[in-house]
Amino acid sequence: MLQRIYLDNNATTRIDPKVKEIMDPFLRDHYGNPSSLHQFGTETHPAIAEALDKLYKGINARDIDDVIITSCATESNNWVLKGVYFDECLKKGKNHIVTTVAEHPAVRSTCNFLESLGVEVTYLPINEHGSITAEQVKEAITEKTALVSVMWANNETGLIFPIEEIGAICKEKGVLFHTDAVQAIGKIPVDVLKANADFLSFSAHKFHGPKGIGGLYIRSGVGLTPLFHGGEHMNGRRSGTLNVPYIVGMGEAMKLAVEHLDYEKEVVGKLRDKLEEALLKIPDVMVVGDRIHRVPNTTLVSVRGIEGEAMLWDLNRSNIAASTGSACASEDLEANPVMVAIGASKELAHTAIRLSLSRFNTEAEIDKTIEVFSQAAVRLRNISSSY
């Protein structure tokens, strides 16, 4: 069987063997419902507490704060936006939300839905580097602003947004602040206190944990109407039987993610840079966005004259996995939204390819990818009518 190379880690990651190992006993032996009073239920409590402790430490949350288990970051994002709608928009008359055009569909689409209910949403434009400034946020806030929601790192470009500056402005203005940290955790340090975050979303499968489990940090003293009703789980904030093996796995994945931050910067970042520099030697290839303020694993490149989907399928034939954009929207075959947002033509935006690495990638895999990508660029341009 030919070697398979996975460079789509911003879509999902392989589960770390240590995570699988720690989950196994709770899939096999300790399967009781944690809410049950008998020993099958109560024997799971120490493992849940330990996992939550790892999550708290991973984002520097305080004991008085809440880290609520959810099914994924999409749920967490929906919960924040819709909860704020109930708590701030309907009850207090604060009918304005500030976000950006670069957000994940889980935020953008939810904001679109809230607009249909009468909420005013300001979508801040990104500049030619793919970023926004804290000053843009400050200027957008009004007396009616209920929430500012800005991602910590962009899923397409890997660009890091000025979260600490934005959080400080929101605190000064008395406006709730939410950040989607899905693409930041495990790649750069994430500290909810330094960020002045009221809410922070994350998803285990983006940092080598299991799929179908995520979390929402809620700062102490901040109310949020539940999205689900039907039980008193998670201090009454989210109903549903706790998924013990996945909670345990997510906790361990968070612990490992923090332990590997230096490796991400020093090793994964250098592999990304090696890949990027080699691809830039191909004529008419460019890197999209700021190349300095990025997470270390991500590059978004445009190969002029080649449809991103064509390059994607060519790479796939050689057992290399990449992406043309967000996995939650990639089947739509739309132009890359970040490239459109920075002002690229739709023709150019269709040429984007995202390559995202992990700590499990090797230098040999990067060398092979460079070889295959370079050959594919020549072959596809030879048959292209637009180059």
From Swiss-Prot:
It catalyses: (sulfur carrier)-H + L-cysteine = (sulfur carrier)-SH + L-alanine. One of its GO terms (biological process) is [2Fe-2S] cluster assembly. Pathway: Cofactor biosynthesis; iron-sulfur cluster biosynthesis. One of its GO terms (cellular component) is cytoplasm. Pyridoxal 5'-phosphate binds at residues 73-74, 155, 183, 203-205, 241. Its cofactor is pyridoxal 5'-phosphate. Its EC number is 2.8.1.7. The modification N6-(pyridoxal phosphate)lysine is found at residue 206. Keywords: 2Fe-2S, Cytoplasm, Iron, Iron-sulfur, Metal-binding, Pyridoxal phosphate, Transferase. It is found in: Cytoplasm. The keyword Transferase applies. GO terms for molecular function: 2 iron, 2 sulfur cluster binding; cysteine desulfurase activity; metal ion binding; pyridoxal phosphate binding. Pfam families: Aminotran_5. Gene3D superfamilies: Aspartate Aminotransferase, domain 1, Type I PLP-dependent aspartate aminotransferase-like (Major domain). The active site is at residue 328. Homodimer. Forms a heterotetramer with IscU, interacts with other sulfur acceptors. Belongs to the class-V pyridoxal-phosphate-dependent aminotransferase family. NifS/IscS subfamily. Master enzyme that delivers sulfur to a number of partners involved in Fe-S cluster assembly, tRNA modification or cofactor biosynthesis. Catalyzes the removal of elemental sulfur atoms from cysteine to produce alanine. Functions as a sulfur delivery protein for Fe-S cluster synthesis onto IscU, an Fe-S scaffold assembly protein, as well as other S acceptor proteins. NCBIfam families: nifS_epsilon (TIGR03403). PANTHER family: CYSTEINE DESULFURASE, CYSTEINE DESULFURYLASE FAMILY MEMBER. This is Cysteine desulfurase IscS. It comes from Helicobacter pylori (strain ATCC 700392 / 26695) (Campylobacter pylori).
